[in-house]
């Protein structure tokens, strides 16, 4: 399986570790490279809650570095200022959730160059912007760990499958804290079948990207919609005149979105689901 997926992504099998979803991947990284009750981790926020959650479980101090408020861009100086003597890991999500934007590569490289610990780039949504992957940086930085998920672009959320990609010595350290047989045969078989049909996955991703454009255009016509941030993921981050009221209204209509910092994270679904969302907002 490592050879098959690695062939698609141009990654040697020795640089790959498979595990049961993003939550386990983050947990393994923390257990491998940070000591509980002593070390800390930094994350650029707003971002996924999994980093804070696993830090708490592993008794690690969780430190936040704010993305630039105007456009949620990564700023290396802010991240490095959040780092302390106990910081072993920096977590960056690109495309970022919930904001949807890719993080600036130049800023990322500055962090990789100046931070002594490991930088984890979570590319769980990278299938929606494959040209932006930082995989090639593995040849340059031994302190880079890349996290990939099969939940979004691969549409296998129920399978709970993820991959960690890093320098072989890093993978060996992760293997020492992981289970002897981390992923079951049934899961590997299901994933292998999807990997063999990569063209179908690419078709699905293109459909989501097309739908994202349509939803964005429809939202921009609404008077209540004040700002739609650029997205390279399978969702949009939208600011409404009263986002809290819109959130409550949609919930009553049976439509679930995620409220974050005065905005709503809206997942792009099937065409009929997107039409239902826009239809409900137009009636408000």
Listing of model-derived features with the role each one plays in the protein:
Residues 2-41, 58:
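Phosphate-binding glycine-rich loop
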Residues 32-54, 68:
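Conserved PLP-anchoring active-site segment centered on the Schiff-base-forming lysine
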Residues 69-123, 127:
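Active-site phosphate-binding strand-loop segment of PLP-dependent enzymes
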Residues 106, 244, 249-258, 262-284:
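PLP-dependent enzyme catalytic core of the Aspartate aminotransferase-like
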Residues 143-221, 228:
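PLP-dependent aminotransferase class I/II
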Residues 208-209, 219-253, 264, 268:
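Conserved PLP-binding catalytic core of the aspartate aminotransferase-like
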């Amino acid at each position: 399986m490592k050879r098959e997926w690695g062939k698609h992504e141009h990654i040697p099998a020795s640089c790959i570790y498979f595990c049961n979803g993003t939550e386990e991947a983050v947990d393994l990284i923390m257990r491998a490279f940070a000591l509980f009750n002593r070390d800390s981790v930094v994350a650029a926020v707003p971002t996924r809650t999994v980093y804070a959650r696993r830090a708490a479980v592993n008794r690690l101090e969780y430190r936040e570095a704010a993305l630039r408020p105007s456009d949620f861009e990564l700023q290396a100086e802010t991240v490095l200022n959040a780092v302390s003597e106990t910081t072993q890991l920096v977590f960056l999500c690109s495309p970022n959730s919930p904001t949807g934007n890719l993080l600036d590569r130049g800023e990322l490289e500055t962090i990789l160059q100046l931070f002594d610990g490991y930088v984890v780039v979570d590319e769980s949504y990278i299938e929606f912007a494959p040209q932006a992957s930082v995989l090639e940086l593995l040849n340059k930085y031994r302190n880079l760990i890349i996290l990939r998920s099969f939940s979004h672009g691969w549409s296998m959320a129920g399978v709970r499958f993820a991959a960690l990609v890093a320098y072989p010595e890093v993978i060996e350290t992760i293997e020492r804290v992981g289970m002897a047989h981390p992923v079951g045969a049934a899961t590997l078989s299901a994933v292998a079948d999807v990997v063999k049909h990569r063209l179908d996955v690419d078709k699905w991703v293109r459909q989501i990207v097309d739908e994202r454009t349509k939803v964005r255009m429809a939202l921009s016509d609404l008077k209540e919609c004040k700002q739609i941030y650029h997205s390279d993921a399978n969702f949009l981050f939208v600011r409404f005149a009263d986002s809290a009221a819109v959130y409550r209204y949609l919930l009553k209509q049976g439509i679930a979105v995620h409220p974050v910092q005065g905005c709503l994270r809206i997942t792009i679904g099937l065409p009929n689901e997107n039409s239902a969302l826009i239809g409900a907002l137009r009636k408000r």
